[in-house]
């Protein structure tokens, strides 16, 4: 007897329909074809034990299972449940006349309990597109799949539940998720708030500009200046995610199995990988590609603390994702693309010792140490960071001040208002949501300068030897500053402020070796051997 059961395979962040054909005929043997991986090939042992422990058995006949399309590789143990049901239905042990109306996924334990899977949300989205009436999956994954409207999602915990459902002995209730309630969660009780930060008004201004325009930012300052504290509070001033952004973010986390017992991810992600991370872990990849940290930070913030401590090769692989807002992983037989539209927030000490330019420190780096330290960050990578800002230690008077600081909620209102201006501006550009995403043509259109502003920018370009990409960055930041003030045109004072936020373009940070030799000798600093 031939039975068809339907499952799904996740490829990138999208799902594809898998047809599982189970045929039982005379003879002996268990034959599984259709490019299954080892986890699927081992499923017969899990299925046999699970069936035995609930009073069923594998038929003593020849079982042939085909997983179509046969040219698409199938991975993981999530096919245990549809395989088991297909065998039971094909052998006549259960009656399942409507089994072809459902997508079925789940891993079986030896006692018949059902374990969670990865990629439930993209599978549910594809199931709706393919016209299925329902989706049976582990109860731990039910909430994320139930985000998809007009699809009945049933969470199950044991194989017997599913058998009773198809035998019409037990009714299952669809899981319902209140999307509006999920969205309300993001504005309640933020873990970090800018009101916790004493002083640093100038840096808070930079963070506000970065949030308003989606600009990448690097914070440069000595240890204890508050760089990490400021970075962790950036998500609290970003505008709330819309439904499309929340779905995109949840899909990525779902593929990695990070959404168990949760519904929609409605809070912008904040990812802070350790500096020992590999390039594959950062951007994604592997023999069977998985999203990396930059995709996990999609629609949120990626924080790289102590940027020069990362391997240069790791930092360089970020150049393409920073520009294209997506990461493409190519293999011989396929290509996978993951979304990676994130805000990069990086921090670094100004020198290996952490106290370069500190007038109170008598221990400074040698010129060789300084060049080696700064050489880990390439010019092309820095060009892709819109805002470079120096963070100075907070004086005691500010730390001991008992007056209340401005809250994240207050800053977020201004940021949201600026984003609304950008939404109206880019209505005709569906792939652009904020100023940082503008290309050269759009910069020329929306960042027109008067003669005063143009002359000011020309002088800055010549004196700082800025690249064409840095020129575009300054214009984007100036446009955001104007949006925060609800100004129609970019003025010279907007340009002047934006130029200030290019610290690493100035001599003294990325200057010649002779500068550091001159600096260390003039300060009388003791040079450390490299």
Locations of the language-model features?
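Peripheral, non-AAA+ core regions of ATP-driven protein-machinery
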Residues: 1-218, 222-228, 330, 470-471, ...
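Short beta-strand elements
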Residues: 18-24, 282, 386-389
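Basic, amphipathic alpha-helical bundle interface domains used for macromolecular binding and assembly
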Residues: 39-44, 59, 66-76, 288-289, ...
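P-loop NTPase nucleotide-binding/switch module
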Residues: 170-209, 213, 240-294
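Walker A/P-loop
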Residues: 219-258, 324
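The Walker A (P-loop) glycine that initiates the GxxxxGKT/S ATP-binding motif of P-loop NTPases
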Residues: 221, 284, 306
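Walker B catalytic acidic pair
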Residues: 299, 305-306, 317
């Amino acid at each position: 007897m031939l039975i068809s059961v339907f499952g799904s395979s996740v490829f990138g962040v999208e799902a594809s329909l898998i047809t599982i054909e189970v045929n039982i005929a005379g003879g002996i043997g268990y034959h599984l074809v259709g490019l299954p991986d080892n986890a699927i090939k081992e499923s017969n042992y899990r299925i046999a034990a699970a069936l035995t422990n609930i009073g069923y058995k594998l038929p003593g006949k020849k079982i042939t299972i085909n997983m179509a399309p046969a040219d698409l590789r199938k991975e993981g143990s999530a096919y245990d449940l549809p395989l088991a049901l297909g065998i039971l239905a094909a052998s006549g042990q259960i009656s399942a006349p409507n089994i072809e109306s459902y997508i079925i996924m789940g891993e079986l334990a030896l006692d018949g309990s059902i374990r969670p899977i990865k990629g439930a949300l993209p599978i549910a989205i594809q199931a709706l597109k393919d016209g299925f009436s329902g989706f049976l999956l582990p109860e731990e994954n039910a909430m994320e799949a139930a985000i998809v409207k007009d699809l009945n999602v049933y969470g199950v915990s044991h194989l017997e539940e599913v058998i009773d459902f198809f035998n019409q002995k037990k009714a299952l209730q669809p899981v319902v998720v209140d999307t509006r309630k999920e969205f309300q969660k993001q504005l309640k009780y933020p873990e970090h708030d800018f009101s916790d930060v004493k002083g640093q008004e100038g840096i808070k201004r930079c963070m506000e500009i970065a949030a308003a325009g989606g600009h990448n930012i690097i914070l440069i300052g000595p240890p204890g200046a508050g760089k990490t504290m400021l970075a962790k509070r950036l998500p609290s001033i970003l505008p709330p995610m819309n439904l499309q952004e929340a779905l995109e973010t949840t899909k990525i986390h779902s593929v990695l199995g990070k959404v168990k017992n949760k519904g929609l991810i409605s809070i912008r992600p904040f990812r802070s990988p350790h500096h020992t991370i590999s390039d594959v872990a950062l951007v994604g990849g592997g023999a069977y590609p998985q999203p990396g940290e930059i995709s996990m930070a999609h629609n949120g913030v990626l924080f790289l603390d102590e940027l020069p401590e990362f391997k240069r090769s790791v930092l360089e692989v970020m150049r393409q994702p920073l520009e294209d807002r997506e990461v493409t992983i190519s293999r011989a037989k396929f290509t996978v693309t993951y979304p990676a539209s994130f805000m990069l927030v990086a921090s670094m000490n100004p020198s290996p010792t952490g106290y370069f330019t500190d007038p109170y420190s008598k221990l400074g780096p040698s010129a060789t140490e300084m060049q080696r330290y700064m050489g880990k960050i390439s010019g092309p990578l820095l060009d892709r960071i819109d805002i470079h800002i120096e963070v100075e230690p907070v004086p005691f008077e500010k730390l001991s001040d008992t007056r209340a600081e401005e809250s994240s909620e207050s800053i977020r209102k201004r940021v949201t208002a600026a984003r609304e201006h950008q939404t109206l501006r880019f209505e005709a550009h569906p792939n652009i949501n904020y100023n940082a995403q503008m290309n050269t043509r759009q910069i020329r259109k929306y960042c027109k300068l008067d003669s005063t502003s143009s002359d000011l920018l020309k002088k800055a370009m010549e004196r700082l030897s800025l690249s064409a990409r840095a020129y575009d960055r300054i214009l984007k930041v100036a446009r955001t500053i104007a949006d925060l003030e609800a100004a129609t045109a970019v003025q010279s004072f907007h340009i002047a402020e934006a130029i200030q936020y290019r610290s690493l373009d100035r001599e003294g940070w990325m200057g010649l070796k002779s500068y550091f030799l001159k600096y260390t000798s003039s300060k009388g600093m003791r040079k450390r051997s490299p």
